[in-house]
Amino acid sequence: MDFDERGPCSSNMYLPSCTYYVSGPDFSSLPSFLPQTPSSRPMTYSYSSNLPQVQPVREVTFREYAIEPATKWHPRGNLAHCYSAEELVHRDCLQAPSAAGVPGDVLAKSSANVYHHPTPAVSSNFYSTVGRNGVLPQAFDQFFETAYGTPENLASSDYPGDKSAEKGPPAATATSAAAAAAATGAPATSSSDSGGGGGCRETAAAAEEKERRRRPESSSSPESSSGHTEDKAGGSSGQRTRKKRCPYTKYQIRELEREFFFSVYINKEKRLQLSRMLNLTDRQVKIWFQNRRMKEKKINRDRLQYYSANPLL
């Protein structure tokens, strides 16, 4: 429908062929929706014009992150009619720290929160200061306390290096204290005497006995002592992988592998000769050959499965 056909359409405006534009003389009390120049039509709205004007997105972005000075983006004078008296009091409380030297970005973020998210039930310290986590306000600290424990636990968990010491049971702490007392000697005894109880001495003695029992004996044979030490180290540090204990030296393994290459099964004479040459017992040579045969069997089985699964190889 062209523009020149809209004129006679005002009398029968409810017909389907009409575009619902009305002219000024028919309805003189209403503002004209279609002026003479269609390209420049001022749209009038039914609501009042005293609502706060919405700022563009760039201004809101700059104000939220305080990229430019706060005074440029906060028209404080003409927004007073939008908020209740309680929120105005909170805004006055916010303006006081700015005179005391609060950084501009903190003030900008807090004032933006006050202007854009009015809540009647907020308290005055909700937006004024930043909370313990450094990002959210102080009112969110209660959620951090319930999620991560009490404030004391929060303060202690800031340093992960001390977690193992704090998580340790009191028995381990008493054991370490008893070991320190055994190392110092007389001062620890005098302090336990000044504690004034035979129970303290008995506890320290029991802890010292437990510590002594936990230490590996160094008087055993080299092979067993090295194995026990490695087991202890692997048990104490769960992260560290336990080093494999091998009772044979590289020279012994090389000679045994050479003999195994010539014959998988070894007779008694050859076994005695090898044990004398390699400074091993007859039983050690026998067990090594048994283990080596089992290893060879497993290698052959894996090789067979690999080549049967890949027929092109």
Swiss-Prot record:
InterPro entries: DUF3528, HD, HD_metazoa, Homeobox_CS, Homeodomain-like_sf. It holds the Pfam family Homeodomain. Disulfide bonds: none annotated. GO terms for molecular function: DNA-binding transcription factor activity, RNA polymerase II-specific; RNA polymerase II cis-regulatory region sequence-specific DNA binding; sequence-specific double-stranded DNA binding. Keywords: Developmental protein, DNA-binding, Homeobox, Nucleus, Transcription, Transcription regulation. Its main location: nucleus. GO terms for cellular component: nucleoplasm; nucleus; protein-containing complex; protein-DNA complex; transcription regulator complex. Residues 154-246 are annotated as: Disordered. The keyword Zinc-finger does not apply. It is found in: Nucleus. It comes from the Eukaryota. One of its GO terms (biological process) is positive regulation of chondrocyte differentiation. Residues 168-193 have a biased composition (Low complexity). The keyword Magnesium does not apply. Residues 241-300 bind DNA. It is linked to Radioulnar synostosis with amegakaryocytic thrombocytopenia 1: The syndrome consists of an unusual association of bone marrow failure and skeletal defects. Patients have the same skeletal defects, the proximal fusion of the radius and ulna, resulting in extremely limited pronation and supination of the forearm. Some patients have also symptomatic thrombocytopenia, with bruising and bleeding problems since birth, necessitating correction by bone marrow or umbilical-cord stem-cell transplantation. Sequence-specific transcription factor which is part of a developmental regulatory system that provides cells with specific positional identities on the anterior-posterior axis. Belongs to the Abd-B homeobox family. This is Homeobox protein Hox-A11. It comes from Homo sapiens.
